[in-house]
Amino acid sequence: LMIGGKKVDYDFLKPLYSDLAIHQGEEFFPGYGAGHFVKMVHNGIEYGMMQSIAEGFAIMRKSKYKLHLRKIAEVYNHGSVIESSLINWMGNAFALFGDDLKGVSGRASHSGEGLWTTQVAHSLGISDKVIHESLKARERSQKKPSYQGKIIQALRNQFGGHNLKK
């Protein structure tokens, strides 16, 4: 939980936040909107990470090798430097839908946080090439569904229950 506002209000509600969050999974950020801002940037970072996963698995799928992508996700998630919840969910998606992600539309949608993050970055004069390009890739997949779009949409389904068919 990323909580903004007044410290006095946070302190009063901290027992509730502690009950809702995993151990050390909540933090206070001073100022109204600060918690939402931190969460927005979190989602922008997530866009870039998911796009990298999509690109990497698309490269492996198209290679001359007969690679089992689910097994790759599993080995990546056991001691690899890219071990993560996202890689774990990728393995789960391959287990459910196969390496071709059958039944997943290939149209990767977004809910706005990546766009808002790029808008803030631009207003601050900060380079955001990865986040910006990951947003553009999702927009392109709406017009031309792709395997990378399938990966993004499968991941979104795994962690947020997002629709696979859109």
Regions found by a protein language model. Name each.
Residues 7-12:
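Short helix-loop capping/hinge motifs at secondary-structure junctions, enriched
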